[in-house]
Curated annotation (Swiss-Prot):
This is Proteasome subunit beta. It is found in: Cytoplasm. Component of the proteasome core, a large protease complex with broad specificity involved in protein degradation. The 20S proteasome core is composed of 14 alpha and 14 beta subunits that assemble into four stacked heptameric rings, resulting in a barrel-shaped structure. The two inner rings, each composed of seven catalytic beta subunits, are sandwiched by two outer rings, each composed of seven alpha subunits. The catalytic chamber with the active sites is on the inside of the barrel. Has a gated structure, the ends of the cylinder being occluded by the N-termini of the alpha-subunits. Is capped at one or both ends by the proteasome regulatory ATPase, PAN. PANTHER family: ATP-DEPENDENT PROTEASE SUBUNIT HSLV, METALLOPROTEASE TLDD. Belongs to the peptidase T1B family. GO terms for biological process: proteasomal protein catabolic process. The gene is psmB. It catalyses: Cleavage of peptide bonds with very broad specificity.
Length: 212
């Protein structure tokens, strides 16, 4: 890996959960530069359309460039076709772009999630352009192994919005306790047919388990 891609990384734990009627995309907020905490307020959940979001893990510069590209591509898709882009189509556009650049890859792990006429869905997209439709939940980044332990244990089908938020926050908290590249609080986005909402910090605090 070149020095350029070693400079600033998001480190990261990201989580995507499908619930009854929508999707939760959640991340923590730490960005690292080697052993240095480079940022305590890194934004890792981005709006792609009013019904689709994307989380980023990996190189900050690579990820931010991809956010700009997919924003433009989704806007062009909707202008040309005169209809809203689906979650699957957005993931495919991103996947194709990454695959075309696989010999000079972007150092990223991405989640693309949202709602369309088929309902809620979340896709994971790797640096080579591999896109996978995740049925229930997914986690990426350096803290994902710890997050998966919580997700596997506590996920249940047809969760409510409240239950899904609580699970996402709990999974992130577990990762932050064990992964040095994850920390500094939470970003949580709720996506349904009615809203694309960034959950404020005071509301997120209400989902945190009591301190031991």
């Amino acid at each position: 890996m070149s020095q350029e891609h070693q400079d600033v990384k998001t480190g990261t734990t990201t989580v995507g959960i499908v619930f009854d009627g929508g999707v939760i995309l959640a991340t923590e907020r730490r960005a690292t530069m080697g052993n240095l905490i480079a940022s305590k307020k890194a934004k890792k959940v981005h709006a792609i359309t009013d019904k689709i979001g994307m989380t980023i893990a990996g190189g900050v510069g690579d990820a931010q460039q991809l956010v700009r590209i997919i924003n433009v591509e989704c806007n062009l898709y909707e202008i040309r076709r005169g209809q809203k882009i689906s979650v699957g189509a957005a993931a495919t556009i991103l996947s194709n772009y990454l695959n075309q650049n696989r010999f000079s890859p972007y150092y990223v792990q991405l989640l693309v999630g949202g709602v369309d006429t088929s309902g809620p869905s979340v896709y994971s997209v790797d640096a080579a352009g591999g896109a996978t439709l995740e049925e229930n939940f997914v986690s990426t980044g350096s803290g994902s192994l710890t997050a998966y332990g919580v997700l596997e244990d506590r996920f249940k089908p047809n969760m409510t919005e409240e239950e899904a938020i609580e699970l996402a926050v709990r999974a992130l908290r577990a990762a932050m306790l064990r992964d040095s590249a994850s920390g500094e609080g939470y970003n949580v986005v709720i996506i349904t047919q009615e809203k694309f909402e960034y959950l404020p910090e005071d509301k997120i605090a209400g989902y945190l388990p009591p301190a031991k």
